Amino acid sequence: MWSAGSGRAAGPALLGILLALSLSGGRAAKSDAGLVTCGSVLKLFNTQHRVRLHSHDIKYGSGSGQQSVTGVEASDDANSYWRIRGGTEGECPRGSPVRCGQAVRLTHVLTGKNLHTHHFPSPLTNNQEVSAFGEDGEGDDLDLWTVRCSGQHWEREAAVRFQHVGTSVFLSVTGEQYGSPIRGQHEVHGMASASAHNKWKAMEGIFIKPSPEAPGGHDEL
């Protein structure tokens, strides 16, 4: 059985983010195009299966019993926003470009839990379960994901992979869909091998401009 959580309300800061997104249509201005930076709030799009990384206050009915993570086709769901944070405090200053090979945390904006994986089987495929874990952005070392990309920094127009630091699996979707109570949502899981199933692209969101002193920043930003 799946179970609903406590339904914690979003705080004022999170509501402010969502208001800004609604006023901008969920898209950053053209002049902000370029690099993904620390502190940005965005949606992640799986390019193979065309779903956005998603979570919600519904727990797995098997495995860890932690908050579930799925993929959704809708582009306008507020439960698909994630904040880019450093692996440790001070490691990812606000506005600094995310480096290829850098470890980051992806914090779900509306519930404050971090993207997480561990050695539990996923419900539909028996791959590695991916969940959302922690409170107010504080979790553990199994919340760390390495950004795998070409070049020096994570570019918004480029597809990247997220490889889990602790278990080496890649954040993946292979197309399987859940029934009730989250009918039509896709299973998100960890897979051992790099493939088209684990390519992700930055989509709608608020992108913090690179700081002037940050290396690799674009002049027009």
UniProtKB/Swiss-Prot annotation:
UniProt GO cellular component terms: endoplasmic reticulum lumen
Segments forming domain MIR: 33-87, 95-150, 151-205
Cell compartment(s), UniProt: Endoplasmic reticulum lumen
Cystine crosslinks: none
Pfam families: MIR
Transmembrane segments: none
Name of this protein: Stromal cell-derived factor 2-like protein 1
